Swiss-Prot record:
It comes from the Bacteria. Residues 37-58 are annotated as: Disordered. One of its GO terms (cellular component) is ribosome. This is Small ribosomal subunit protein bS21. It comes from Streptococcus sanguinis (strain SK36). It holds the Pfam family Ribosomal_S21. Residues 43-58 have a biased composition (Basic residues). Keywords: Ribonucleoprotein, Ribosomal protein.
Length: 58
């Protein structure tokens, strides 16, 4: 869980920018999108295998 405390004399935009950076760095949004729908283990293995094949191709 990312937590951002607004500093003294800091604008809300700056605090929001810091929060977004922290969330991105922690991978929270990616994890949420990945877990949004249930993925069967067979589909997960297939996706992982295709990603590895794609990486190996380059």
């Amino acid at each position: 869980m990312s937590k951002t405390v607004v500093r003294k004399n800091e604008s809300l935009d700056d605090a929001l920018r810091r929060f977004k950076r922290a969330v991105t760095k922690a991978g929270t949004l990616q994890e949420t999108r990945k877990r949004e729908f249930y993925e069967k283990p067979s589909v997960k293995r297939k996706r992982k295998s295709e990603a590895a094949r794609k990486r190996k191709k380059f």
